[in-house]
């Protein structure tokens, strides 16, 4: 089929997809008036001290840090697909209040997301994201124990790092949080199944052969993928402020980023790295109403990690850290405690 033919098919399908977005808007508009997050400063993370880390292929990653470099433990947060570091706002607030100077936090925008640089299509892979995470850890927390917490694509990034840098899990990383994620691709379930249609295929073809056209037609292009992600974000009715923030992060993500990462999300498989992750305390958490990565994927992941804590969040959608922050924050507290304990045990073993 010619490019124009594929684009014709794409345009003909937008009415149906737009109606899905309309359902999301109606649900948001019907939320209760008592605003839980009225006055919440969701830009607080963006005012933290900033640095830039260059990846091995020259992409600048924007990194922000909270806490003293002398803190006994650092937590590195890795966000998911079509999000940015602000997706961790409620966890940043909680960890700062709960742990104070005992825990330092590092946040960054993944390549092609937020304020970080735009990569080429061929480097939009989970493997490359793993190398990026390794670079952030090396430059921003060069010594001391580290807990890594990844959501969605950020969890996949963390598992990729285990494949590439098992030495970090033997020496530095003392805990791993895997939220709403999977070790293998999405082509069989969740988001992958939703993306198996000729509309998405047409748009992928256009992104490969005519990226200028795709970027110019970004309004039309967003109607392909974003309604699926919006509908899957929450399993329950949430605060309008949270819905607005997640919408804004999605809307500000480049169309090319949205498309260029689809292939790797569907096909990646880092299952061979799970024994490395199994050597440190781990948390596996997912909502059982997640339509992007189903809870069954988290069950399978936890079964492969000896001693993993599996947390099932009843009614939770894909943005579970926004939707059920109390449950997520409590689970993170337990992971941090286990990370501290693992570090103490490792030091004692080294002395013996």
Across the structure, where does each feature detected by a protein language model lie?
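Active-site loop/oxyanion-hole signature of alpha/beta-hydrolase fold enzymes
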Residues: 104-156, 163, 168-169, 330
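Short beta-strand/loop motif that positions the catalytic acidic residue
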Residues: 277-278, 284-286, 290
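Conserved alpha/beta-hydrolase catalytic His-Asp/Glu region
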Residues: 212-276
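Catalytic active-site module of serine/aspartate enzymes centered on a nucleophile-bearing elbow/loop
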Residues: 306-352
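Flexible "cap/lid" loop of the alpha/beta hydrolase fold
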Residues: 163, 167-214
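Hydrophobic alpha-helical topogenic segments used for membrane insertion/localization
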Residues: 2-30
